From Swiss-Prot:
GO terms for molecular function: DNA-binding transcription factor activity, RNA polymerase II-specific; RNA polymerase II transcription regulatory region sequence-specific DNA binding; transcription cis-regulatory region binding. Keywords: Cytoplasm, DNA-binding, Homeobox, Nucleus, Repeat, Transcription, Transcription regulation. It is found in: Nucleus; Cytoplasm. May interact with MYF5; regulates MYF5 expression. It is linked to Up-regulated in myoblasts of facioscapulohumeral muscular dystrophy (FSHD) patients (at protein level). Overexpression in primary myoblasts results in disorganized myotubes, troponin T delocalization, and abnormal beta-catenin accumulation following differentiation, suggesting that DUX4L9 up-regulation may contribute to DUX4 toxicity in FSHD. Expressed in muscles, as well as in primary myoblasts and myotubes (at protein level). The gene is DUX4L9. CDD domains: homeodomain. Residues 19-78, 94-153 bind DNA. Gene3D superfamilies: Homeodomain-like. One of its GO terms (cellular component) is nucleus. Residues 278-302, 319-329 have a biased composition (Low complexity). Its main location: nucleus. This is Double homeobox protein 4C.
Length: 374
């Protein structure tokens, strides 16, 4: 027996073509007939619903929805009043026969499901005309299909990609960072909050070494823009500047790190040649630092275990601050070898003291810098 659909006589012509079905307004006589049937049996069978639908002039699927909504309202009211729900009364009535869907009908429904998992009333009515099935059964078919296959069909949510899922060179470009690394003692750096999964996905300003597969990169709240590398360093605190990453193809050649410029000078008065001092540095990692000409990283001068680094201009330093020429003053002598504290570090951290054993290279570059300044 073919069931009437809402498109036969109940819905006006202007309601068809919209995304959702138009709300059905019940007349007082229809509401009384429905409530009287509900008092007799809250769970009417298919035969009772069809007779009631024919009597009040409403399609049977709308009558079924009304009974479902009324049962939900009554159940909520009984729960608020702490009364037990009576449930079914009387003998159970027959249920609707299972709708048989042929292979061709299933193929049409599957193609429509692949295009749109949530078809509107107009699309469902069009499918009802093509398949010969009632629109209400098509709606139930789509509901069941969405429940069984939540990830299939159209309008699927896009997968959110992250830094680790993005291929090198793809996605949004990462901002250029100049990272700071917190050091408790010279040569010891704290681990970064997060580490990119691939060296190709590292943002500019992170530090790549030949010995390290992934280098730590700080969060944006702890980083400064690349243009701000010549900004003054903090007056106090145990922070070390980190040199920017070299361009592609130049990772195998170590470059000289930059000490922070003088705090009292402006950006225009600073000489970029005076700010940079020679000497390789290592990537800051937990534990003893491994210095060597392997790449750029956080500048972490070595010291003994008992003498921490208190900041710029205080305590022992590796290369010292940049020389500032004065009127009538002769250039200072060549830097002296490290003191006893650095010698004690050689025994505990042999890797960190290796960059200091290059007097020829250091004196040559320092002499050239002093000659240019004079």
């Amino acid at each position: 027996m073919a069931l009437p659909t809402p498109s036969d006589s109940t819905l006006p012509a202007e309601a068809r073509g919209r995304g959702r079905r138009r709300r059905l307004v019940w007349t007082p006589s229809q509401s009384e007939a429905l409530r009287a049937c509900f008092e007799r049996n809250p769970y009417p069978g298919i035969a009772t619903r069809e007779r009631l639908a024919q009597a009040i002039g409403i399609p049977e699927p709308r009558v079924q929805i009304w009974f479902q909504n009324e049962r939900s309202r009554q159940l909520r009211q009984h729960r608020r009043e702490s009364r037990p729900w009576p449930g079914r009364r009387g003998p159970p009535e027959g249920r609707r026969k299972r709708t048989a869907v042929t292979g061709s009908q299933t193929a049409l429904l599957l193609r429509a499901f692949e295009k749109d998992r949530f078809p509107g009333i107009a699309a469902r009515e069009e499918l009802a005309r093509e398949t010969g099935l009632p629109e209400s059964r098509i709606q139930i078919w789509f509901q069941n299909r969405r429940a069984r296959h939540p990830g299939q069909g159209g309008r699927a949510p896009a997968q959110a990609g992250g830094l680790c899922s993005a291929a090198p060179g793809g996605g949004h470009p990462a901002p250029s960072w100049v990272a700071f690394a917190h050091t408790g003692a010279w040569g010891t750096g704290l681990p970064a909050p997060h580490v990119p999964c691939a060296p190709g996905a590292l943002p500019q300003g992170a530090f790549v070494s030949q010995a390290a597969r992934a280098a730590p990169a700080l969060q944006p709240s702890q980083a400064a823009p690349a243009e701000g590398i010549s900004q003054p360093a903090p007056a106090r605190g145990d922070f070390a500047y980190a040199a920017p990453a070299p361009p592609d193809g130049a990772l195998s050649h170590p470059q000289a790190p930059r000490w922070p410029p003088h705090p009292g000078k402006s950006r225009e008065d600073r000489d970029p040649q005076r700010d940079g001092l020679p000497g390789p540095c290592a990537v800051a990692q937990p534990g003893p630092a491994q210095a060597g000409p392997q790449g750029q990283g956080v500048l972490a001068p070595p010291t003994s275990q008992g003498s921490p680094w208190w900041g710029w201009g205080r305590g022992p330093q590796v290369a010292g601050a940049a020389w500032e020429p004065q009127a009538g003053a002769a250039p200072p002598p060549q830097p002296a070898p490290p003191d006893a504290s650095a010698a004690s570090t050689d025994a505990s951290h042999p890797g960190a003291s290796q960059p200091l054993q290059e007097p020829g290279r250091s004196s040559t570059v320092t002499s050239s810098l002093l000659y240019e300044l004079l």
